[in-house]
Structure formats: C-alpha cells, structure tokens
Curated annotation (Swiss-Prot):
Protein residues bound to siroheme: C492
HAMAP family, per database record: CysI (MF_01540)
Named cofactor requirement(s): siroheme; [4Fe-4S] cluster
Species of the source: Neisseria meningitidis serogroup C (strain 053442)
Quaternary structure (record): Alpha(8)-beta(8). The alpha component is a flavoprotein, the beta component is a hemoprotein.
Reactions mediated catalytically: hydrogen sulfide + 3 NADP(+) + 3 H2O = sulfite + 3 NADPH + 4 H(+)
Keyword Nuclease (UniProt): no
Protein name (database record): Sulfite reductase [NADPH] hemoprotein beta-component
Annotated family: Belongs to the nitrite and sulfite reductase 4Fe-4S domain family.
C-alpha cells in the first residue's frame, strides 16, 4: 500500500505506509473490536489492532515489569493493566470531581495512586481490563473523558497555570479549551465503546461519520499544543508541535497570540535522522482567528506529515522537509489570511511559584510541590489523602501544573488557614524542599512504562539528595539548576529542555546532556554517554564547582556551560544536534 495524497514533492510519498495507517483506516473510526476484547477473560490485555487502538481512547496497555520475569517463570502472562490519561485542558479540575476520582483510584487501580503529569492532567496506573468501562462511565458522569490524550491526535492542551493576571489567564484558558474542543475527533467510537457499550450494527452508521479536521486516518503522529502567558514559560512552550503565546494589550486583556510550530523533544539513540527541536515562529493572529490558525497548522501537518516513517512524522520534520517559509505559506493559505508580524515577548523563568500567591482579584492560590507528580499514601506519607481532605472543604478549584505540581486555586482569605493546616498535616507543605528539587522533574519509567530503559521517577529523589549535597558543598544551595530525568529518549520527562538532562540508555545507565537554559528556549548538548548515576554525580561535582567559582552574577548553570565552552550550543538541531565535535567533553575523551 503506497501513499495516495494530493500533496506533491515529498520524498516519502511513494514509500509504503506504516502499518499504523492501515490500522486507522480499518478501525471503523477507532472502534475496532475493542468490545470483543473486553469480554475475553483469558487475557488481561488487548489483542491485535486493539492494542494500538485503545491509545486513541487515552489508554496504554502496560504491565508490572518488576515481576515480569517472576510471572514468566511461573508460566503466567505479564500482570497486564491499563494506564488512563484524562483530557483536562489547562489542568483545571473541581474538588467534587477529584473526590470521585480519588475513590476510583483507591478501589480499582493496582497502585492506588494518582499521577499528575507534565501535560497538566492526571493518570491512573494499573487499571484492570474489567474496570475500564466503569472508569470511563465515571469520567463521563463527571463531565470528563480521555479521548485523544494519546496516539495520533492533538493531545491535552496546556495553559499557563499560575493565575496572577486573572483576567488574562481566564481569557487564555478559554482559548485552550476552545482549541482542545475544536481539534477533537468527531467519531462516536469512544462513547459507543466505553459509555454505551454497544457495537454499531450497520455500515450505514459509519457513512454518517466524518472527521473534517483530522481525517479518516487522523494525524501522522502525536501532536501537542500549548497556550502560554509570558513571562512564565511553565508549559515549556518550545517543546510542542503548536504554541499560542498570549500577548497582552497592556491593560491586562488578550490582544492575540504569537503562533509557533515544530517543537518536540523525542529522538532515538543513535538515529541521526531524529532530533529534538524548539518550535519556530509563524506569526501573530488576533484572538478571533486562533481556531483558524490551529486548524490550519493541524491540517497542514495532516496532509504533509510523513505517514511512511513514524520516527520522522512529527511536525518538526514536516517543517524541515517543506522549509519554514513554505510551511508558513501553506498555513496562511488554509487560514485564508496572512500572519501579522510576531509581537515582542520574553520569558524569564518556568518554575512554579511554590506556596501562597495572591491574585489581582483578591483570591489566594496555594501551589503544592508534588515530587514527580505522584500522589500516593506510602512510606509514611499521606499525600493522596491530604489532597482528598482539602477537596472536601475547598470551594475553588484545583489546577494541575505542567511541572507536575498542584495548585489549590481561588481560596478566599477566610479559608486560607484551614487549607494550609491540612496541607501541612499531610506533608503537602514541607520546609525541607530545596530550589533544586522544586525545579526537578521525571517521567514515570519503571515499573509500568514498557519503553523504559532506565529508572527515572524512582531514582529522582535520591539523585536530587546527592545533587543537593554537591550544591551545598560549593555554596550554591540558594540557587537551582533545572534538572530532569527521563527513562528513555522519547522525551516524556522533557530532559531536552533542561540545564541538566539525563536520558535513559540502558539499565542503570544514562546519557548526560547539559547546556539548556532556565527559560526553556535551548536544547542541551550531549556531554557524556552511557554512564552511571555515580559517574554523573562526579562529573556534576566538578562542573558545579566551576560554575560556583566562575559564574557571572545571576548566570544559570546552562548559560555558564555555554559561555565557558564546556559545550557548544545547539543552534540548529536538524544540523548540529548530533555533531559530537561540538560536545567538548566527548571530543577530548
């Protein structure tokens, strides 16, 4: 089967389609035979195409890798269960919804936890197949769903979390919701399978369905969108396929958006045809044209994106293949209007404001630091219970941040003391969290992620403990370095926008990247390859010592590494990301 498309001049067009394209074409608008698999008691998982199709419904099949070998020895299949990721544009959720979600996690998930993600939503881990319809029906009852939070669609739309400029944030959040809804699939397959629980009986039913934006075969690959309000880059906007940078009119109102496209952080070890890249500027649009711009970028990627090689199918590769000017021109043609010139903007940081902050409307917002976003009652901590107890009395809302933290938002002055008392009682407010730890992040990795090559979430606390000691040794404890660990090169931990990024290479081994910046606008350079955590700490001890002794006033670690030539900056990732001659430490090794 070869590509049949109206587009011309793309080298991949005459190559065979990837099998995922066949799968989508034959899926009956994402229904497949999922309902049949739900009735099969012989396996805890899904068979054939359904293994992939459930991803379009916001789920991944996983197993507990800690006991995989043990179960194999006992002639048992892996302990299979599902990860579910909710669709939650901007990360806002009501306390009443949270109470019900907490109950489900405790009663029906293997790990009895809720994981806050860096895409501003939550995940259930370890949900057995028999509980999936129960879970989706609960989400539906709560006004939530998980459609399009995975697979080849526009994923959960991010929006700057900290609501200091309340009116501007409200307006930006409304557009995040509108963009999310506008780019959703139109198929009823999700409802038919998970809520109604019935098969479509006639082929005529399929003739009535259409996907005017995504198309019958949806997008070539995953697609990520964010709305960001400068000067805070908490959503890491340069790592997304599509970004809307909210521009104020000077009076706290939304003037419009700068539109950026082509960011993405995944790669494949040793494959120089893959690379992370920051998003590029297309132009400015007024608010009323934001949806047109979103649709135009998505449909351009739909029609020009690589459907032969999934490793080169993201928007950044489409822009590289077409050229930025041609990509922009095609988007403008589809919008029916040209972009205006980019409006000036600047980012000054991207960490969350931990603690209490007062909004301009007089309400208070408490940002709770949640290490790696994991809410669970274990190891003497009752973080999950703490959030539940707050939810029982909170009159505002919760906001999940893109840094895996939780904001107890819109707290009245009269309720502030009680909220803080509960947070302290359950360990949600701690006095021993360093700035370094507040600015660290990890993906989930072992034991549930099937792609994990090395630990991430489970080693982050101890790794930061050791890095804190190094910071103290060199007199920099009052400062921070944006540090991220990801268990494989797929980019979920956003290590490719960190000052210090660890990327899993094999069991207990990582590639060490340095030279990103605090604002999240530069890709870090590979510094040392395939080394252990103790070896990484030894390298960082030396480098942090140099930073402490030789840095300029206010100079971050990543900027120092670039200025002093420890590594050369990644200036044009498609060309120089893999250029090891610019990784000074490797060249001299």
């Amino acid at each position: 089967m070869t590509v049949q498309t109206k587009t011309k001049g793309l080298a991949w067009q005459e190559k065979p389609l990837s099998d995922n394209e066949r799968l989508k074409t034959e899926s009956n608008f994402l229904r497949g035979t999922i309902l049949d698999d739900l009735k099969d008691p012989l396996t805890g998982g899904f068979k054939g195409d359904n293994f992939q199709l459930i991803r379009f419904h916001g789920m991944y099949e996983q197993d507990d890798r800690d006991i995989r070998a043990e179960r194999a020895e006992a002639k048992l299949e892996p302990l299979k269960f599902m990860l579910l990721r909710c669709r939650l544009p901007g990360g806002i959720i009501k306390p009443s919804q949270w109470i019900e979600l907490d109950k489900f996690a405790r009663e029906n998930s293997h790990y009895r936890s809720i994981r806050l993600t860096n895409r501003q939503t939550f995940q259930f881990h370890g949900v057995p197949k028999a509980k999936l319809q129960t879970m989706h029906r609960l989400l539906h009852k709560l006004g939530l769903d998980s459609i399009a939070t995975a697979a080849d669609m526009n994923r959960n739309v991010l929006c700057t979390s900290n609501p200091i400029e309340s009116e501007l944030h409200r307006q930006a959040y409304e557009y995040a919701k509108k963009i999310s809804e506008h780019l959703l699939p139109r198929t009823r397959g999700y409802l038919d399978v998970w809520v109604d629980g019935k098969k479509v009986q006639s082929s005529d039913d399929f003739l009535q369905e259409d996907e005017p934006i995504l198309g019958k075969t949806y997008l070539p690959r995953k697609f990520k969108t964010a709305v960001v309000i400068p000067p805070l880059n908490d959503v890491d906007c340069y790592g997304n396929d599509l970004d809307f940078v909210a521009i104020s009119d000077g009076n706290g109102q939304l003037a419009g958006f700068n539109v950026l496209a082509g960011g993405g952080l995944s790669m494949e070890h040793g494959n120089t045809k893959t690379y992370p890249n920051i998003s590029l500027e297309l132009g400015f649009v007024p608010p009323e044209h934001a949806l047109k711009a979103a649709e135009a970028v998505v449909t351009t990627q739909r029609d020009f994106g690589n459907r032969s090689d999934r490793k080169n199918a993201r928007t950044r590769y489409t822009i590289q293949n077409m050229g930025l000017d041609n990509f922009r021109a095609e988007v403008e043609r589809r919008m029916g209007m040209p972009f205006e010139p980019i409006r000036p903007f600047k980012f000054t940081g991207r960490g969350d404001r931990i603690g209490w902050v007062k909004g301009i409307d007089g309400n208070w917002h408490l940002t709770l630091f949640i290490e790696s976003g994991r809410l669970v009652d274990e190891g003497g901590k009752q973080l999950l219970t703490g959030v539940l107890e707050i939810a029982k009395i909170h009159k505002g809302d919760f906001r999940i941040t893109a840094n895996q933290n939780l904001i107890v938002a819109n707290v009245a002055e009269a309720d502030k003391a009680k909220i803080e008392e509960l947070a302290r009682t359950y360990g949600l407010i701690r006095n021993d969290v360093s700035k370094l730890r507040e600015n660290a992040m990890s993906c989930v990795s072992f034991p549930t992620c099937p792609l994990a090559m090395a630990e991430a979430e489970r080693v982050l606390p101890d790794f930061i403990d050791e890095l804190d000691k190094i910071m103290a040794k060199h007199g920099t404890s009052d400062d921070y370095i944006v540090t991220r660990i990801t268990g494989c090169p797929n980019g979920c931990g956003r290590a490719m926008l960190a000052e210090i990024g660890l990327v899993g290479k094999a069991v207990e081994r990582y590639n060490l990247h340095i030279g990103g910046d605090r604002e999240g606008v530069r890709i870090p350079r590979l510094y040392k390859e395939n080394i252990t955590l103790p070896e990484i700490l030894a390298e960082l001890d030396d480098l942090i010592g140099k930073w402490a002794a030789e840095r300029n006033i206010g100079e971050g670690f990543g900027d120092f590494a670039i200025r002093t030539g420890i590594v050369k900056p990644v200036l044009n990732a498609p060309v120089d990301f893999w250029d090891v001659s610019k990784a000074v430490a490797i060249a001299r090794a």
